[in-house]
């Protein structure tokens, strides 16, 4: 038995070893295999073998040491768990022998996790379940999970949506205080806010949208003048009814955006607000933030102004009907339009044509990528995929929205504060690949400096008509950086504009809702709860997660739909390649 002196010496030896050990902080990066890496804060990656990956979860912050396993090769040993942010996840309930487990669907957790008897909530084999990490695996590589909720079984109607909501931590139901706030609102709430607003209820504003749209947040009208047109864009004004810092605003921030899942969207605001009291429905007075702007004959923008107004839409028009009117058709529905509305639509088309011509010459137009609508059956699975054809009415609305948003960006830039959409263009880390691509297939374009606004614009314009062995424009488009929100005005390279923001979808996007607050605060001293940098980052992360959720659900539904199709060969074009395979755009609908 060791005496006290020996024990003290042993403890001191352990302390000395620990103090002399070189540890590196970093973040765990999983792979599709059982091994992984730690991305060190100093910028390099350290390999983690399977036995070490068993002790950590994706995204864990850890301290690692390095040990040499053979000459010139090292691997990491997890020395300390600093933080673990992965607390909940989804998976499938499994039983093997006497053990009950969850097979996580979270990327990077490539193992089953044991569920103790008291934490199983009567889940059955193959149930989809929502779980919590009950015991982290750091100490011995044996983690445990706790079932928080049984989501359902594969094959149940709507299981794909329910699973996706749980997987991305998206709330479906409204918190009680939000629902209570929404239920307290009524038509009298609209009337209560009309004092001090311009009365534009007699003006021929109309909405142009899909027939099934209920959350209509923009209405348009236009009149000719000596140098072009006066374009008036009325945007729904939910900020008038929702107090800063109220439960509804906090929940809108938490959701960040409406998500248009096939068959059943997930709104940002309760239906009472988004599809009734603030939606610009026809023949009822509604509150609006209006942008009046001068469109010159050459499509350039002149003076603009913002107004708080009350409008009354003179019609809920479909894209198809407006497109028919533009084409000169004389359908019964077109003949039934009031003269003031028909004349306004004609002026809107002329103004939008000029706006688009100016953007084509001085900025960048986005390509009309093929879009499709998923039609679901009673079991909430795809029964039909049909093309969503973009017509002249879609382009009319797009040009009006872009013009109004450009005015909002310019106004906020003049105020010295705002919320802007910044797009730096091509990714810096792809510069060498882009240079080699251009030198190989378009050497005459390699001279353009894509890091500058003019160089990027020229490069993208020239590649539109480029004939080469490979689709250079398509490849370049996949090298673009992601657009980000920022408090300072900066170029939006993807659109070829010096500054850009959006305020035209306040019922659907919190960033637009917030821009309303900024404009009204600057012009009329309306109250605002300002965002800080941490909140801005959280907002962007939630927006990104929402896009991932929508893509995940659509991919799942499409994969199931593909199983029902005949096994006959179909023709298509390879649209993208990856190390794991490639994507094909089918020629058929």
Describe the role of every protein-language-model region.
Residues 1-226, 322-326, 332, 373:
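OB-fold/S1-family RNA-binding modules
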Residues 20, 54, 111, 125, ...:
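Electropositive polyanion-binding surfaces
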């Amino acid at each position: 038995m060791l005496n006290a002196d020996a024990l003290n010496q042993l403890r001191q030896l352990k302390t000395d070893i620990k103090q002399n050990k070189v540890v590196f902080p970093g973040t765990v990066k999983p792979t599709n295999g059982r091994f992984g890496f730690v991305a060190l804060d100093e910028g390099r990656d350290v390999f983690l073998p399977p036995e070490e990956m068993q002790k950590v979860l994706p995204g864990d912050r850890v301290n690692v040491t390095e040990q040499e396993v053979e000459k010139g090769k090292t691997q990491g040993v997890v020395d300390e768990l600093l933080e673990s942010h992965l607390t909940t996840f989804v998976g499938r309930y499994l039983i093997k022998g006497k053990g009950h487990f969850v097979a996580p669907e979270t990327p990077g957790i490539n193992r089953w996790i044991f569920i103790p008897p008291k934490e199983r909530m009567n889940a059955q084999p193959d149930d989809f379940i929502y779980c919590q990490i009950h015991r982290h695996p750091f100490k011995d590589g044996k983690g445990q999970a706790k079932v928080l909720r049984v989501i359902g079984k594969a094959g149940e109607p709507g299981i794909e949506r329910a699973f996706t909501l749980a997987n991305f931590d998206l709330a479906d139901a409204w918190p009680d205080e939000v629902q209570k706030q929404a239920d307290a609102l009524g038509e009298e709430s609209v009337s209560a806010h009309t004092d001090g607003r311009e009365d534009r209820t007699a003006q021929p504003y109309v909405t142009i949208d899909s027939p099934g749209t209920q959350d209509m947040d923009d209405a348009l009208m236009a009149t000719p003048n000596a140098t072009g047109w006066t374009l008036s864009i009325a945007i729904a004004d939910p900020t008038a009814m929702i107090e800063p810092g109220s439960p509804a605003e906090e929940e809108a921030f938490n959701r960040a955006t409406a998500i248009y899942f096939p068959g059943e969207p997930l709104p940002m605001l309760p239906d009472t607000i988004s599809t009734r009291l603030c939606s610009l429905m026809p023949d009822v007075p509604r509150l609006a933030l209006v942008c009046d702007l001068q469109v010159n004959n050459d499509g350039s923008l002149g003076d603009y102004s913002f107004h708080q107004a009350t409008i009354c839409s003179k019609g809920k028009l479909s894209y198809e009907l407006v497109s028919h009117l533009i084409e000169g058709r004389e359908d019964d529905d077109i003949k039934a339009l009031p003269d003031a509305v028909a004349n306004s639509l004609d002026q809107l088309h002329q103004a939008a044509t000029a706006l688009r011509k100016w953007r084509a010459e001085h900025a960048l137009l986005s390509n009309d990528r093929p879009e499709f609508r998923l039609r679901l059956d009673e079991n909430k699975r795809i029964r039909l995929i049909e093309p969503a054809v973009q017509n002249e009415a879609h382009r009319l609305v797009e040009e009006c929205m872009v013009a109004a948003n450009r005015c909002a960006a310019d106004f906020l830039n003049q105020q010295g504060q705002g919320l802007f959409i910044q797009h730096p263009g091509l990714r810096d880390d792809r510069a060498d690949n882009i240079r080699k691509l251009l030198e190989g297939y378009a050497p005459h374009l390699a001279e353009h400096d894509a890091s500058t606004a003019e160089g990027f614009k020229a490069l993208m314009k020239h590649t539109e008509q480029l004939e080469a062995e490979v689709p250079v424009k398509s490849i370049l488009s996949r090298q673009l950086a992601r657009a980000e929100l920022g408090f300072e005005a900066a170029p939006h390279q993807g659109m070829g504009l010096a500054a850009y923001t959006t305020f035209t979808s306040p019922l659907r996007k919190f960033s637009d809702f917030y821009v309303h607050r900024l404009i009204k605060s600057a012009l009329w001293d309306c109250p605002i709860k300002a965002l800080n940098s941490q909140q801005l980052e959280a907002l962007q992360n939630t927006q990104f997660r929402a896009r991932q959720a929508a893509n995940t659900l659509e991919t799942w539904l499409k994969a199931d739909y593909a199983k029902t199709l005949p096994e006959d060969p179909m023709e298509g074009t390879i649209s993208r390649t990856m190390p794991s395979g490639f994507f094909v755009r089918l020629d058929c609908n």
